[in-house]
């Protein structure tokens, strides 16, 4: 029998509105004229060339609303991690005096990147050397466990490249 009263679930309808707004926000962002250093761990050189050239994504192959939500959660978690580290006695600088991120550029500006922060001091009993870069990564529990077991380089090679850049 056909059910003409079937509707998507409430949370799915709300999420579709959120995703559409995130898609619209992303569409308004100015396109990069450089290759982001966070992409250096991507193995497919052709994909990197297309990205650098500004080729459009294949239909349905861009960042979905779900992925954009995950990115936003990562930014919020980064803010919390910075706060917690500072509370624990770390001197962590995550913005320049003008408010922008610390960044770098190579290859006449064709390659650019940013760091999440720079740590210049920590509790002495940790025995750390300074300065050191701070890179904050978030991931689902199953990915975290895989990284703990096999290492970031094996489990998340793109993350490993980002942290090493």
Language model features with spans:
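Metal-dependent nuclease catalytic cores that hydrolyze phosphodiester bonds in DNA/RNA
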Residues: 1-133, 140-142, 146-153, 157
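Residue-level detection of beta-strand scaffold positions
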Residues: 133-134, 163
